């Protein structure tokens, strides 16, 4: 057996695999634990390996032995790994492990390392190893390795795979369907990336995939691993990146999966208060245990390596780095504060090893606090993520847009406050699934006013997001302003698009997405100071916000003006950085987008009229509850109008 295994995994020995596993540095555990062919001969059977260090006995039971105890496994006491060769086992048979736990209880457990599971609600693992796949994404991957993503557009379409669309009989889409329909749709809409909510095996659809049982398997209801590989392959050939949510902090409490696997805390913390996640009805991983680290890091590498993912969004980072995040009792760390030292160290380790192997990957944190530096280099004291969701921006902006415009003048800080901290992290601006469920209402429904005004404000909200520094994310159905909340077990309300206003809203989102990709000032300077220049963030009376996004060249900039009231602002004056002529290139109130305007504002010629610290200014008309974007048409870049700001080339 050892010779065959060594051949399969290069020249690494079984003992080395075990040692690295116990040290927390085995990042390809999926090539060792779980089920693997004994040799290349299809008739030679499979070897099964599972970690259950405190079990009294483990049997592998399956279709190959009528689910009896005829195949007791052998324990390697040093590593805690049980193993057995089963010559009779064949591909696609079902199996589980019968674990005699430390207290003598016998329970059927699924294989934590399985790469395929029986379709839910059944929970058996499947005897199967993934076959080599013929990828055709070399050009895409080569470009990604050479690209600095901080200075390139990232606009993410967030998707819950099974509920994007449903068939006429009510059955939800699988990846075979999504390859045919989602990819051309995303390409047409102008997004750069698709981010999937968790795709790994999970027993409860209502968890949306955030309470996992199988960290190495595509959810059986979503299609086959090869179908997902086909999907990623096709995305890359269409210049679309693929990200997946990953949940390394907590897992499903289901008794037949990871929970107290050998009858003792195996994957979870020893301390029951730390193990139990009361708020989510789940269990927390012991992030300080070396074997758990090997398990989780191997899961990340499995998805990145085997499926050519372009990155991951790590779910619920706050729960991993703060001891007092959850409900219920908690104990301070050895320094007397609330930081989860093991969780912090694990996430730094995760980012370090993943970025070493895949420097081109996008690693994003869903994290809502402001007390820890999440993005940035580990050497600078950060946890090491590339990006962090800006939950503060999202909460403030949505509160503002739900507000009656009469009160907005006294709350303009809700949309301007983010200008004070936009460089504190590398941010993604998220309008995600979390904001359109559980009675929170859809984005469209959140907007103040009648239906016409709701569409107008949704266009303005999206314009503000796209013009604001940071990467972008929008949850599916937001692009056309679906009025109903998202339902995880039901396809999106595509029938909405029969309505002219929804269809025009979808068209606007597509135009805005393509505009973002084409306009370099919106991304080429990344987080540099020079990319953002605020013209006026203090116009409370008119409740109008104006700012500039700069590119590398002096002449490359966009002027953004947003009107948050239902009053059209005519002859509205703002300062401009250079003397000359400015032309309107986007107006959210155009008829093609669902507004009433049939033509753009005439070009604006600057005047030597001071505005704040600007020597030159222009006047224009800003539509009610709308936004306009201006671009220099013919300007004198040799002398800057502003007295206080010098934009460097």
From Swiss-Prot:
The reaction(s) this protein catalyses: Transfers a segment of a (1->4)-alpha-D-glucan chain to a primary hydroxy group in a similar glucan chain
Keywords: Carbohydrate metabolism, Glycogen biosynthesis, Glycogen metabolism, Glycosyltransferase, Transferase
GO MF terms, alphabetically ordered: 1,4-alpha-glucan branching enzyme activity; cation binding; hydrolase activity, hydrolyzing O-glycosyl compounds
GO biological process: glycogen biosynthetic process
SUPFAM superfamilies the UniProt entry points to: (Trans)glycosidases, E set domains, Glycosyl hydrolase domain
One GO CC term on file: cytosol
Source taxon at top rank: Bacteria
Involved pathway(s): Glycan biosynthesis; glycogen biosynthesis
EC number annotated for this UniProt entry: 2.4.1.18
Major enzyme class: transferase
CDD domains reported in the protein's UniProt record: AmyAc_Glg_BE (cd11322), E_set_GBE_prok_N (cd02855)
InterPro entries, A to Z: A-amylase/branching_C, Branching_enzy, GlgB, GlgB_N_E_set_prok, Glyco_hydro_13_cat_dom, Glyco_hydro_13_N, Glyco_hydro_b, Glycoside_hydrolase_SF
Active site: 315 (nucleophile), 366 (proton donor)
Subunit structure: Monomer.
Record family assignment: Belongs to the glycosyl hydrolase 13 family. GlgB subfamily.
HAMAP family: GlgB
Entry function: Catalyzes the formation of the alpha-1,6-glucosidic linkages in glycogen by scission of a 1,4-alpha-linked oligosaccharide from growing alpha-1,4-glucan chains and the subsequent attachment of the oligosaccharide to the alpha-1,6 position.
Protein name: 1,4-alpha-glucan branching enzyme GlgB
Protein source organism: Ligilactobacillus salivarius (strain UCC118)
């Amino acid at each position: 057996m050892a010779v065959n295994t060594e051949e399969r995994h290069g020249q690494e020995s079984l003992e080395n695999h075990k040692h690295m596993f116990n040290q927390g540095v085995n990042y390809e555990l999926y090539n060792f634990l779980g089920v693997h062919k004994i040799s290349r001969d299809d008739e030679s059977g499979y070897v099964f390996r599972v970690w259950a260090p405190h079990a009294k006995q483990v049997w592998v039971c399956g279709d190959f032995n009528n689910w009896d105890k005829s195949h007791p496994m052998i324990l390697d006491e040093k590593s805690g790994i049980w193993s057995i060769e089963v010559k009779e086992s064949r591909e696609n048979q079902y199996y589980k492990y019968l674990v005699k736990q430390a207290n003598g209880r016998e329970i059927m457990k699924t294989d934590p390392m399985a790469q395929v599971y029986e379709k839910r609600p059944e929970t058996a693992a499947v005897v199967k190893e993934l076959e080599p796949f013929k990828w055709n994404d070399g050009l895409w991957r080569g470009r990604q390795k050479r690209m600095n993503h901080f200075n390139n557009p990232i606009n993410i379409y967030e998707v819950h795979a099974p509920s994007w669309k449903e068939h006429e009989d009510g059955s939800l889409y699988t990846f075979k369907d999504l390859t045919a329909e989602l990819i051309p749709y995303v390409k047409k809409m102008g997004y750069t990336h698709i981010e999937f909510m968790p795709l790994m095996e999970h027993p409860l659809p209502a968890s949306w995939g955030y309470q996992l049982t199988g960290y190495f398997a595509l959810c059986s209801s979503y299609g086959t691993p090869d179908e997902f590989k086909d999907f990623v392959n096709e995305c890359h050939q269409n210049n679309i990146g693929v990200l997946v949510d990953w949940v390394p902090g907590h897992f499903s409490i289901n008794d037949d999966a990871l929970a107290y696997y050998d009858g003792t805390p195996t994957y979870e913390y020893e301390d029951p208060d730390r193990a139990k996640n009361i708020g989510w009805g789940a269990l927390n991983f012991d992030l300080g245990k070396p074997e758990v680290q090997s398990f989780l890091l191997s899961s990340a590498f499995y998805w990145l390596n085997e499926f050519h993912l372009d990155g991951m969004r790590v779910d619920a980072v706050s729960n991993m780095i703060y001891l007092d995040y959850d409900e219920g009792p908690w104990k301070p760390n050895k320094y007397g504060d609330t930081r989860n030292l093991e969780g912090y160290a694990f996430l730094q380790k995760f980012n370090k090893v993943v970025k070493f192997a895949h420097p081109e990957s996008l690693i994003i944190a869903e994290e809502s606090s402001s007390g820890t530096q999440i993005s940035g280099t580990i050497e600078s004291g950060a946890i090491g993520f590339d990006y962090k969701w800006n939950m503060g921006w999202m909460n403030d902006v949505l509160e503002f847009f739900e507000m009656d415009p009469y009160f907005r003048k006294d709350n303009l800080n809700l949309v301007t406050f983010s200008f004070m901290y936009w460089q504190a992290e590398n941010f993604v601006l998220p309008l995600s699934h979390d904001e359109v469920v559980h009675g929170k209402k859809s984005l469209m429904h959140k907007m103040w006013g009648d239906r016409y005004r709701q569409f107008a404000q949704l266009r303005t909200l999206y314009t503000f997001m796209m013009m604001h520094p940071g990467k972008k994310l929008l949850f599916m159905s937001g692009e056309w302003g679906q009025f109903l909340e998202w339902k995880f077990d039901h396809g999106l309300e595509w029938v909405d698009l029969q309505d002219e206003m929804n269809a025009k809203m979808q068209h606007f989102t597509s135009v805005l997405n393509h505009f973002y990709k084409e306009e370099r000032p919106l991304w080429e300077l990344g987080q540099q100071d020079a990319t953002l220049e605020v013209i006026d963030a203090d116009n409370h009376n008119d409740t109008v916000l104006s700012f500039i996004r700069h590119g590398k060249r002096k002449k490359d900039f966009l002027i953004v003006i947003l009107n948050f009231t239902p009053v059209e602002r005519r002859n509205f004056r703002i300062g401009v950085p250079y003397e000359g002529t400015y032309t309107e290139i986007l107006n959210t109130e155009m008829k093609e987008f669902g507004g009433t305007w049939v033509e753009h504002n005439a070009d604006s010629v600057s005047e030597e009229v001071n505005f704040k610290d600007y020597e030159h200014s222009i006047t224009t008309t800003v539509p009610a509850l709308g936004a306009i974007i201006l671009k220099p048409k013919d300007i004198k870049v040799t002398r800057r109008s502003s007295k206080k700001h010098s934009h460097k080339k």
